[in-house]
Amino acid sequence: MPSSSSDPIGPWFIAAEALGEYIGIRFGRVAPGDNTPEWIFLRHTDVDGIGGMADLLRRRGAEIPRLPQIKHPSAPSAFSLLRSMPKYLRPRHPARWRPLEGERRNSTHSDPPPAVAWHIFDEPESTQIRRVCRKAGVTINSFLVKHLTKAIRPSLEDESSVVPWMIPVNVRGKVDLGRDTANHTSYVGVRVRSYETVRDVHRNIYEALGRGEHWANWQAYQFSRFLPFRVKKSMLAQGKATSEWYLGGFSNLGDWDPESRITRPECQGGWLFAPPVLRCQLLGAGCVTFQNRLSLTLQVHPELSVNPEVPAAWVQNWIKEIEIDLASVLSEPVAHPHPRLVA
């Protein structure tokens, strides 16, 4: 039986909003035959990524009876939090960026980040990516995180830096918040080193899950319900609201409607998704597979850059790294257009 609980995540996003952060989760739909996304933003106080995707599809007439459930067998445990406490107490060492093109701008709670780029693979390309990951015995998450990190490294002052990512973990099936679209999301951190392979990244993610780091972070958020609002704001402002500093968040909403049973016109096309960006987490990378087409979306916090060419270059590099990996395994490389961006 899933444990009953209340949402411990929403109050943190309310505190972030009070600090001027935009807390909308970015979703997008590119209608068939169109090249311009219809952007939709849902507050992270109300839904998480999976919940938001389900909510949007349901509102457009799709039947989504049951949301994805956690697959990893580790059980919730307070001991995992005790074991992780030293990690919370370590000093934070954010990476330094090389100068990026374009201006920076203060974040406001009312304006979405203007610097965003995206790409949607067609069905054969998406199938190739799944096939290569299956052959290598790795997840699509591990594959994409490794190549995203390599794509961004040239923009860091020290290209050999260890790059930490926050990777959300869906805890539905072991936690019940009453409403299935609510914030059923914890996270693990994965630190990607320049010399590591996709298999190394895959192993590191699963070792973190095996240690129960997602349950440690979930328990930490549960205990944080007793913190005063001003303390939450202070911790966010100091970058201490997570177990360590992260370059950004990488979130995969998984595979939706692979049998293409959803036929409502309002749901058709390619779907996009990116998690929010915060001052303590400057990049938001998201992917989702809808009706066998994988999409990539990358947005940048405005205090890093408001120039959409910045994430567009990173997405272009990301696709290139994916293509190189596919070409090393498959006889025919993936052909791809330039990534889309929003000015």
Regions found by a protein language model. Give the residues of each.
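Short, exposed beta-strand "edge-strand" segments with a Pro/Gly-rich flavor and a Y/T-containing core
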Residues: 72-74, 114-120, 136, 193-196, ...
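Amphipathic alpha-helical recognition patches that constitute DNA-binding helices
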Residues: 51, 73-76, 80, 139, ...
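Non-transmembrane alpha-helical segments in soluble domains
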Residues: 54-57, 130, 149, 202, ...
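Non-catalytic, low-complexity flexible loops and terminal extensions
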Residues: 1-23, 54-128, 317-343
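Acyl-thioester-dependent acyl-group transfer interface
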Residues: 1-36, 40-50, 66, 154-343
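Bulky hydrophobic/aromatic packing residues
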Residues: 46, 101-106, 118, 128-129, ...
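Gly/Ser/Thr-rich phosphate-binding loops and adjoining beta-strand/alpha-helix segments
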Residues: 24-39, 108-172
